């Protein structure tokens, strides 16, 4: 497989722009005898036998892929973005570090929100590169970073950027991605984070680590064209600065923002009372009730 990693898997309808190297380890490369790989294989055998297969996505995100999956399962249902379905409920926003109040003082589309989820943290060298890129670019930022990782930041960074941005151990991600001041989401490209960014109409700078993250990042960059993968796959000061400039300032970034806004509108349409995801969700409930 090694010499074919750059090839696309166009034989799968809807994945014509995805490369072999974008797929998760254990699918077509890596340790195919691992527990994870064997689990994926067993899931692949079981899914066609399922009464229904439901996905946290929406039809218009990738219609060709949705049609392909629908042809392979007894009943295929897109029921997302689930974050938008749940947002219709009255919920108290948790913001213990005052991120949203800080955002109110920033201009529209100017802020970089940075978070890599709860599992992964970039290695020390990349954390330093992110900090250096932020400081040099002067881009306002909200950075969600575990407290134990603060020691990896350049000496004096927090003091020097006190007026430019905030570093917090936790941030209200959904609300930040909906805020008009947010201009870019720097992310690991976990699926929930990608959907939340799509739902907010926010372009992404992607730094995938494992699992489906590379595939998601590839889709963000070349399928939906709502962001870009970090240059050469890892953070460097200069590379990160160039990405921030491209997304927040250059014409390419304006196109990404426009595409992201269109997907946001389609996502909200999907979860409206007569939207496809809402109808599918009701269909899923009926299927579960009938089985019980």
Kindly label every feature range from the protein language model.
Residues 1-175, 184, 198, 209, ...:
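Nucleotide-sugar-dependent glycosyltransferase catalytic domains
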Residues 166, 180-193, 202:
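Acidic donor-binding loop of glycosyltransferase active sites
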Residues 193, 204-206, 210-211:
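Short glycine/proline-centered loop/turn elements that form peptide/ligand docking sites
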């Amino acid at each position: 497989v090694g010499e074919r990693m750059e090839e696309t898997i166009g034989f799968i309808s809807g994945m014509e722009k995805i490369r072999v190297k974008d797929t998760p380890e254990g699918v077509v490369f890596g340790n195919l005898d691992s527990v994870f790989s064997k689990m994926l294989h067993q899931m692949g055998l079981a899914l066609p036998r399922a009464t229904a297969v439901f996905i946290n996505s929406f039809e218009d995100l990738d219609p060709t892929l949705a049609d392909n999956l629908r042809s392979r399962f007894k009943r295929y249902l897109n029921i997302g973005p689930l974050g938008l379905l749940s947002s219709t409920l009255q919920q108290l926003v948790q913001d213990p570090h005052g991120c949203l109040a800080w955002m109110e003082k920033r201009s529209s589309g100017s802020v970089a929100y940075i978070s890599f989820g709860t599992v992964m943290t970039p290695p020390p060298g990349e954390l330093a590169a992110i900090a250096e890129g932020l400081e040099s670019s002067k881009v306002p930022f909200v950075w969600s970073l575990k407290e134990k990782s603060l020691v990896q930041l350049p000496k004096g960074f927090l003091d020097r950027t006190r007026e430019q941005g905030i570093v917090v151990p936790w941030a209200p991600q959904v609300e930040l991605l909906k805020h008009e001041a947010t201009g870019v989401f720097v992310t690991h490209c976990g699926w929930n984070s990608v959907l939340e960014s799509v739902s907010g109409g926010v372009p992404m700078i992607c730094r995938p680590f494992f699992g489906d993250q590379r595939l998601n990042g590839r889709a963000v960059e070349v399928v939906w064209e709502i962001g870009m993968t970090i240059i050469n796959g890892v953070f460097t000061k200069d590379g990160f600065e160039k990405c921030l400039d491209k997304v927040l300032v250059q014409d390419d970034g304006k196109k990404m923002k426009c595409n992201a806004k269109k997907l946001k509108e389609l996502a909200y349409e999907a979860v409206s009372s007569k939207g496809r995801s809402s109808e599918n969700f009701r269909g899923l409930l009926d299927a579960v009730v009938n089985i019980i």
